[in-house]
């Protein structure tokens, strides 16, 4: 039977009858390990106005661990009398709860009897949020985590540090957040603020909650205390999601260097030929700083993985730094490139000694790491780095910028492009076991608010969820679009913005004779406003309620607003009146049909046909190859 579950399950079998929700749900976890999952499920049920409590003595919903199932797999069985959730692990049971939750969205007081047998295609189904370029509060991260749980994501990667901000409390280095978490508005902020003004769109304003004023100056930023991190990690864990921290090393480190200048080779914050000033990894004190920061992470993040970045490092300062040159000689390295490789290997060893696994962007494939480290492939224009990582025995997470960087602007084609991407083409099948999974990323240089993030993320993130979970033969874009409206409604209900479908009924450029009738079809649940003078519409502009006529040249500017009053993207269409063209000469006596000229042309470029020898002329009543035309054929048809 057809369901509206995203990602689509492996198998759904219809049963007889329905389970009535009116009598409430009494939950019994069969294993103490499942009590957090039972608490979570009870919370989900209450959010859907279903009475729920744990009651082992009179239960009508059971949670069980079943070692016969795949570790992350689950079964969900609904009969008129009871509901059973089984998982190969606690994570599997939480995935079963996610499917049950989606059935509740369309249940309307009852649930259909059915049986779902399901398991993921990939073990790693991740999402990365950049909180360094623009900061997102603990509450916003937790709200997003809840959306991830709905769609069976199981990794949340937090990009906690970068040139533009340090977002996690490190008790040994208090300046990292006291100073490094705050900045004078920078070029990224200026781009956002200019867009907010030009487009009359508050979702590009810097949130007031992330601004403080010091001596009359505005400072933007924010950070997570260690207690905040513990709360986020626990919240995610209850939802089957592991939180991966990223501390970007040894590049992308200006926020740290600005607080502790001795971390840089020359003590200055700045930029090189391509990237920002890196850490001075020739000094033992810098290595100690890195180890001390990572050590504090170990107590906060239970995850096996620690992401160290490793990308886009400006190595030129190391070439003239006495400390770095001394390190290069002492370690018998060949230049600055090998110095970074040495640093990455040392960090790998340090993490391994603490039971952690190094994870980094695909640049680390050049650093001679052991196969125990994992690689996140992002440079879609360099597929060789993906195959190199797999050939070297690394576990790999695919995160290609072309398909899974969701911070880019959207259009009508981007959802299909994301959905249609295949992570495991035939060329990679030999290394299938090395592919841990896939991850979507949200970089936030021009994304200052949750509403701006939501418009970029949704519904594309749901497409990523289906690619990560469902087998290729189960994925169908038309069916995905069929299931989508329910989920968009739930996003809106949860306070999350999403990209509205395009307004139908108008082209970008329009030419008309006399008058043009404009018939627009806005997305469901949206209000459409427009102007005819090129200005940006808002809710004070003309609202579209019925077709209208245009008689003069103008620019029609359209913008939709969702139920929460959040503005969608702006679309412009030009209208220009014209008249029928006058004949360039007396047509003389005309015959019905098309004039077809046959040229002796054997090329493949239409523009060159009439340069070949003319063979004959014909009159035809349609676009056909006339009788008698053989050999090299180049035809040009004229008429109207």
Protein language model regions, located:
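Contiguous, structured surface segment used for ligand recognition
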Residues: 1-124, 452, 456, 468-490, ...
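Short, compositionally stereotyped local motifs that mark structural "simplifiers"
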Residues: 28, 471, 475-592, 603-605, ...
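Feature activates predominantly on carbohydrate-active enzymes
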Residues: 69-287, 293-305, 346, 350, ...
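Hydrophobic faces of well-ordered beta-strands that scaffold small-molecule active sites
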Residues: 125-129, 156-158, 243-247, 306-308, ...
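Active-site beta-loop-alpha junctions enriched in small/polar residues
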Residues: 132, 161-165, 248-252, 311-313, ...
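Active-site neighborhood of glycoside hydrolase catalytic domains
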Residues: 256-262, 267-372, 379-388
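Flexible, acidic glycine-rich loops studded with aromatic residues
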Residues: 358-373, 379-517
């Amino acid at each position: 039977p057809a369901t509206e579950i995203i990602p689509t399950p492996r198998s759904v079998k219809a049963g007889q009858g329905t389970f009535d929700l009116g009598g409430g749900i009494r939950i019994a976890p069969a294993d103490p390990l499942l009590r957090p999952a039972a608490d979570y499920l009870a919370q989900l049920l209450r959010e859907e106005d279903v009475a729920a409590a744990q009651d082992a003595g009179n239960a009508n919903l059971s949670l069980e661990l079943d070692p016969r199932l795949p570790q992350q797999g689950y079964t969900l069985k609904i009969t008129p009398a009871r509901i059973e959730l089984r998982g190969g692990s606690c994570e599997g049971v939480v995935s079963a709860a996610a499917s049950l939750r989606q059935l509740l969205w369309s249940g309307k007081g009852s649930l259909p009897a059915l049986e779902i047998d399901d398991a993921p295609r990939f073990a790693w189904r991740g999402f990365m949020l950049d909180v360094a370029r623009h900061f997102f509060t603990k509450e916003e991260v937790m709200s997003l985590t809840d959306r991830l749980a709905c769609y069976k994501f199981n990794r949340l990667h937090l990009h906690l540090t970068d040139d533009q901000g340090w977002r996690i409390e490190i008790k040994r280095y208090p300046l990292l957040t006291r100073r490094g978490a705050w900045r004078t508005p920078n070029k990224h902020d200026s781009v956002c603020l200019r867009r907010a003004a030009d487009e009359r769109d508050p979702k590009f304003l810097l949130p007031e909650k992330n601004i403080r004023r010091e001596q009359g100056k505005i400072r933007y930023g924010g950070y997570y205390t260690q207690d905040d991190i513990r709360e986020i990690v626990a919240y995610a864990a209850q939802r089957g999601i592991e939180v991966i921290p990223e501390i970007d090393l040894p590049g992308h480190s200006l926020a740290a260097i600005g607080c502790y200048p001795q971390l840089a080779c020359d003590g200055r914050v700045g930029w090189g030929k391509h990237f920002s000033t890196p850490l001075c990894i020739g000094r033992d004190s810098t290595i100690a700083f890195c180890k001390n920061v990572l050590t504090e992470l170990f107590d906060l993040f239970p995850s096996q993985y620690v992401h160290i970045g490793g990308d886009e490092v400006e190595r030129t300062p190391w070439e003239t730094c006495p400390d770095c040159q001394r390190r290069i000689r002492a370690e018998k390295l060949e230049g600055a490139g090998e110095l970074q490789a040495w640093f990455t290997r040392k960090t790998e060893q340090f993490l391994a000694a603490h039971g952690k696994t190094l994870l980094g962007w695909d640049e680390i494939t050049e650093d001679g790491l052991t196969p125990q480290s994992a690689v996140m492939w992002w440079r879609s224009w360099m597929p060789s780095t993906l195959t190199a990582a797999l050939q070297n025995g690394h576990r790999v997470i695919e995160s290609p910028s072309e398909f899974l960087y969701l911070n880019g602007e959207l259009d009508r084609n981007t959802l299909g492009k994301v959905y249609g991407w295949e992570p495991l083409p035939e060329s990679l099948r030999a290394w299938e076991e090395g592919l841990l999974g896939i991850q979507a990323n949200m970089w936030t240089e021009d994304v200052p608010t949750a509403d701006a993030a939501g418009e970029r993320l949704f519904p594309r993130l749901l497409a990523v969820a289906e690619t990560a979970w469902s087998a290729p033969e189960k994925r169908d874009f038309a069916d995905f679009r069929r299931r989508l409206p329910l989920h968009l409604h739930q996003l809106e209900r949860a306070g999350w913005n999403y990209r509205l479908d395009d307004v139908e009924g108008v082209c970008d450029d329009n030419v008309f004779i006399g008058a043009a009738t404009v018939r627009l079809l806005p997305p469901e649940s949206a209000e459409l406003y427009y102007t005819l003078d090129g200005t940006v519409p808002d809710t004070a502009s003309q609202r579209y309620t019925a077709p209208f006529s245009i008689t003069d040249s103008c620019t029609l500017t359209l913008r939709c607003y969702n139920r929460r009053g959040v503005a969608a993207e702006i679309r412009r269409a030009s209208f220009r009146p014209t008249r029928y063209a006058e004949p360039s000469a007396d047509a003389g006596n005309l015959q019905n049909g098309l004039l077809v000229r046959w040229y002796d042309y054997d090329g493949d470029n239409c523009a060159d046909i009439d340069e070949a020898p003319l063979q004959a002329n014909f009159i035809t009543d349609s676009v056909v190859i006339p009788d008698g035309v053989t050999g090299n054929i180049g035809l040009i048809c004229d008429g109207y």
